Design a protein with these regions (language model features):
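Conserved ASCE/P-loop NTPase catalytic core
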Residues: 42-397
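Long, basic/Gly/Ser/Thr-rich N-terminal segments
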Residues: 3-56
Length: 397
């Protein structure tokens, strides 16, 4: 590689970019809404009751379908099950993308697959983290569309569905009227607020439209492993907020609880567990119970209903150590494992290099000889192939 003089290129007009930016903002401008539960039932729910009663798996799969319909249509059969959400950033792992898409399709249909934790397994830099990041960014954008409109109880740290307000004795009639089944339960926080602020009149409870945002901890939660000796399950489920206990006087009051755990941030969306097999066993059982039963149990409170999709990823070394312990067999049965290996296509490997080079500003003045990326990709692929067992064959044949 040698430094060369940059090519003289005509700069695109800035006014054109500003116009495109304004158009993008206009297209993605979502209408905020705030009202009572009575107004929600009268003005919002009748538009499409099924859409407003979606589970997290259904919501995520609808987002994937929205990307497939709203963006480029590919003729390549390898991409038939993948969506435009992935195809511009992930190369050479189409089988893994297909399996992930199929997982969400089956889970959205209500099959038992949705009661299993999705585990992405593969070597470092294989695309696992990038896949989860794209899913989170896709959810954020989808929630700003009309199709992805999401409504929650105003002020709830769990941004729970307004439909959870419907009493159990009335849910049968609700199903007959609107054609949807309610499975969620009101959280202790919202239940206490309903009693204290509204004297039990749930029709007056405020409802608002919310937008999924990792930065705002709405619909996206992330947990990264800590030192096992210092890791605290409070990072997942929260703990007593001692600063509030002094004013409230009761540690069992939901208002005295810190609802900052990752599982609460992920409610109605997705929880990413980074290097999940490095966490304590009690963490794993809590997550698997959450996946299967949609509930978590914390001290001083009854079961807390949470509807979220858990996506975990880990590397091969940690997974092999996990397999060696027999007591982990029951945990494996509750996981859907999707392998995300390195690509074995030199063309896809070269596309990865081209993407990395084009995104680095330092390479804009660097000349690359023709096919140099393809050549580097070939050598990289050869290091990933097993030695042939048949005599007379080598890795170049």
């Amino acid at each position: 590689m040698t430094l060369t003089q940059p090519l003289q290129r005509s700069e695109p007009p800035r006014n054109s970019f500003l116009d495109d930016l304004a158009t993008f903002a206009s297209e993605h401008r979502a209408q905020h809404w705030h009202g009572t539960f009575a107004e929600f039932l009268e003005n919002i729910l009748p538009k499409d009751p099924t859409r407003f009663a979606r589970s997290s798996h259904q919501y995520l799969y609808d987002m994937l379908c929205w990307y497939r319909d709203a963006n480029t249509v590919f003729d390549d059969p390898k991409l038939s099950a993948a969506t435009d959400l992935f195809t511009h950033d992930l190369f050479g792992i189409e089988p893994a993308l297909t399996r992930v898409t199929d997982y969400f399709k089956a889970a959205a249909a209500g099959s038992d697959v949705g009661r299993r934790l999705l585990l992405l397994l593969g070597p470092p830099s294989g695309g696992k983290s990038s896949m989860v990041i794209l899913l989170k960014r896709g959810l954020e954008e989808y929630s700003h569309t009309d199709d992805g409109a999401l409504y929650a109880l105003a002020g709830s740290p769990l941004h729970e569905s307004p439909l959870n307000l419907i009493p159990a004795s009335m849910r049968g009639r609700f199903r007959d009227t609107y054609g949807v089944h309610i499975t969620g339960e009101l959280s202790p926080y919202s239940a206490a607020r309903l009693s204290d602020e509204f004297a039990g009149d749930f029709m007056k409870f405020p409802v608002e439209r919310v937008f999924i945002s990792e930065a705002s901890r709405v619909g996206v939660g992330t947990y990264a492993p800590h030192d096992p000796t210092t890791a605290d399950i409070a990072d997942l489920v929260g703990s007593v907020d001692l600063s509030k206990v002094a004013n409230i006087g009761d540690e069992g009051d939901p208002r005295a609880w810190s609802w900052s755990g990752a599982v609460y941030a992920a409610s109605r969306g997705v929880l990413e567990m980074i290097e999940i097999l490095k966490v304590k066993r009690e963490f794993l059982y809590l997550l698997l119970t959450l996946t299967q039963e949609k509930n978590v149990k914390v001290s001083r409170f009854p079961l807390i209903h949470l509807d979220e999709t858990i996506i975990a990823h880990t590397n091969l070394a940690e997974f092999n150590r996990f397999l060696q312990e027999k007591e982990n067999e029951a945990l494996l049965d509750r996981m859907v494992i999707v392998k995300v290996p390195y690509t074995l296509s030199y063309k896809d490997e070269a596309r990865i290099y081209r993407k990395l080079v084009s995104s680095a500003s330092a390479f804009k003045l660097v000349h690359l000889d023709p096919h140099v990326l393809e050549l580097a990709a070939v050598f990289a692929i050869l290091t990933r192939l097993d030695k042939p067992q048949r005599e007379g064959l080598d890795l170049t044949k």
